[in-house]
A protein has these predicted regions:
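A short, acidic, amphipathic alpha-helical segment used as a generic capping/interface helix at domain edges
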Residues: 243-256
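Conserved active-site loop/cleft motifs that coordinate metal ions or position small ligands
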Residues: 192, 261-268
Length: 292
């Protein structure tokens, strides 16, 4: 049975204002497992060498203990290997067992393969400290390059003992994929799910490659952000768990079949208040079988 966690990006406004207050609020809603979000530094800032709270490791460990929360992973961006090394050492001290690439963008197949070499190196560095490295997808990893999806190229060119995956089911659907089939392909390399829902009243193409994004062009961060900033219908195409159209129980069933340990709420956008939103999803998760 999967444990329910939350990606702290779900309360991003609170997180940016006061990360410790955000952690306390999330714990009071009832979330006992968190995946942290380490934001890229602003110009002139040094990168965060921890898990996004700006605290020394010993203090971070105590804070998690005080709130009765376990950090199960972290999302981060990696400017260089030295930053990665520092973060891994921090996580080892705090007791965070996984570290993830929040996103990456790819210009062509050769670029995918080059980045896979980096992922393998990050995976090896992580493994040496008893930590697992994983990749979190959006929709663009299912773009095809020379007849294969970026995701398949990644699977073929990363070491299954070093690089694992966190499947965001929503984003897979937005690329025209069946998350259950993707989970079957991942097998034991799948270690977490990300879950949200697709609004029932969303009336544009669900598959973003169906006339919204040109799958023949390279997809950059600007492409990605521009899509959602330019059209509110895209930017607001997220719903609380259980309020939309995704067959979430089928995802839970398959993940449990594969012995996936965590299903993690990630609410990219909400029309509700952040705490109201994550509380609603918390209650909705209780209605599904196979989640505790």
């Amino acid at each position: 049975m999967m444990k329910l966690g939350i990606q702290m990006f779900s309360v991003k406004n609170m997180l940016m204002e006061d990360p410790i207050k955000a952690l306390k609020a999330v714990s009071e809603v009832g979330y006992k497992y968190i995946e942290t979000a380490v934001m890229p530094p602003q110009p002139g800032q040094k990168p965060d060498l921890g898990i996004g709270f700006g605290l020394p490791a010993a203090q971070m460990k105590q804070l998690l203990n005080d709130y009765g929360v376990k950090a199960i992973g972290s999302h981060a961006y990696y400017p260089d290997m030295e930053v990665m090394k520092a973060r891994l050492e921090y996580q080892k001290e705090v007791g965070v067992p996984t570290i993830g690439a929040a996103a990456s963008f790819f210009t062509d197949e050769d670029d995918v393969k080059r980045q896979c070499e980096t992922f393998n190196k990050l995976g090896e560095m992580s493994k040496q400290l008893g930590i697992r490295f994983y990749y979190h997808n959006h929709f663009h990893e299912f773009q095809k390059m020379n007849g294969k999806t970026v995701y398949d190229i990644m699977l073929e060119n990363t070491d299954p003992d070093l690089v694992f995956f966190e499947l965001d089911t929503y984003w897979a659907v937005r690329a025209g994929m069946d998350p259950v089939s993707v989970m079957d392909k991942l097998g034991k390399r799948l270690i977490m799910l990300h879950q949200k829902d697709l609004p029932a009243d969303y009336n544009l193409a669900i598959n973003l490659f169906d006339g919204i994004i040109d799958g023949n062009e390279s997809i950059t961060m600007n492409t990605f952000m521009g899509l959602f900033m330019a059209n509110p219908a895209h930017g607001q195409a997220f719903a609380e768990v259980g309020t939309g159209t995704l067959p979430i129980q089928s995802y839970i069933d398959k993940a449990n079949e594969l012995n996936v340990e965590y299903i993690v709420l990630e609410q990219d956008f909400t029309k509700r208040g952040e705490l109201e939103s994550i509380t609603y999803s918390m209650e909705a998760f209780k209605k599904y079988k196979g989640v505790e």
